[in-house]
C-alpha cells in the first residue's frame, strides 16, 4: 500500500513522505490514527499544496511539546510499594501509573502509551524511563521504587553522590 505521511512517524518518515508500507500496517495503524493518507493522485496534489500548512502545524505542536519537556525533564517520581524481603514488588509499577503520576506533577495529560519501559518494574530501585512526547522528541524521567519514604530518600542521596562522582571523574 502506498501512503503519504501527514504527521511525522518515528522510524518511518516525516510529513509529506510517500512510502510503501504493508497493507495491514497502513489500514490498521497509519490510516485510523490519521498519521497518513492513501497515495492517490488527488491526495498527492493536495499534499503538495498543503505541505507547508502541515509543517507549520507540526512546528507549533513541537514548540508546545518542548515547553512540556522543560517541565518533565529531571522529574523524579517516587512510588512507595510493599515488597518481599528481597525487594521484589507484589505486582509492578506500570506505564499507566507512571503516566498518571507524571500528569499530576506537571498538570498536563500524558498518555500511558507514550511511556516507554525497557522492562517491567518489579523490584525496588532507581529506573530511567523514556517518555515519547513527539516523533522527534523524548524526555527522560527517573522513577524511584521504594518500601518507604526514608528508603526513597536514601536512593536519591545515592544517586546524587554517583552523579557528583561522575562529574569529578570527567573533570
Curated annotation (Swiss-Prot):
InterPro entries: Ribosomal_bL9, Ribosomal_bL9/RNase_H1_N, Ribosomal_bL9_bac/chp, Ribosomal_bL9_C, Ribosomal_bL9_C_sf, Ribosomal_bL9_N, Ribosomal_bL9_N_sf. GO terms for biological process: translation. GO terms for molecular function: rRNA binding; structural constituent of ribosome. Pfam families: Ribosomal_L9_C, Ribosomal_L9_N. GO terms for cellular component: ribonucleoprotein complex; ribosome. Keywords: Ribonucleoprotein, Ribosomal protein, RNA-binding, rRNA-binding. NCBIfam families: L9. Binds to the 23S rRNA. Belongs to the bacterial ribosomal protein bL9 family. HAMAP family: Ribosomal_bL9. This is Large ribosomal subunit protein bL9. The lineage of its organism: Bacteria, Pseudomonadati, Pseudomonadota, Alphaproteobacteria, Rickettsiales.
Amino acid at each position: 500500500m502506498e501512503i503519504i505521511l501527514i504527521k511525522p512517524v518515528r522510524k518511518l518518515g516525516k510529513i509529506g513522505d510517500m512510502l510503501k508500507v504493508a497493507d495491514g500496517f497502513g489500514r490498521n495503524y497509519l490510516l485510523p490514527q490519521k498519521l497518513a493518507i492513501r497515495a492517490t493522485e488527488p491526495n498527492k496534489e493536495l499534499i503538495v499544496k498543503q505541505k507547508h500548512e502541515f509543517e507549520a502545524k507540526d512546528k507549533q505542536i513541537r514548540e508546545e511539546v518542548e515547553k512540556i519537556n522543560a517541565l518533565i525533564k529531571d522529574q523524579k517520581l517516587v512510588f512507595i510499594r510493599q515488597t518481599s524481603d528481597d525487594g521484589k514488588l507484589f505486582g509492578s509499577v506500570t506505564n499507566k501509573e507512571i503516566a498518571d503520576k507524571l500528569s499530576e506533577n506537571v498538570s498536563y495529560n500524558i498518555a500511558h502509551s507514550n511511556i516507554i519501559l525497557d522492562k517491567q518494574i518489579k523490584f525496588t530501585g532507581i529506573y530511567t524511563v523514556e517518555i515519547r512526547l513527539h516523533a522527534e522528541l523524548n524526555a527522560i524521567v527517573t522513577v524511584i521504587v521504594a518500601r518507604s519514604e526514608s528508603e526513597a530518600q536514601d536512593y536519591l542521596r545515592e544517586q546524587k553522590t554517583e552523579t557528583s562522582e561522575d562529574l569529578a571523574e570527567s573533570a
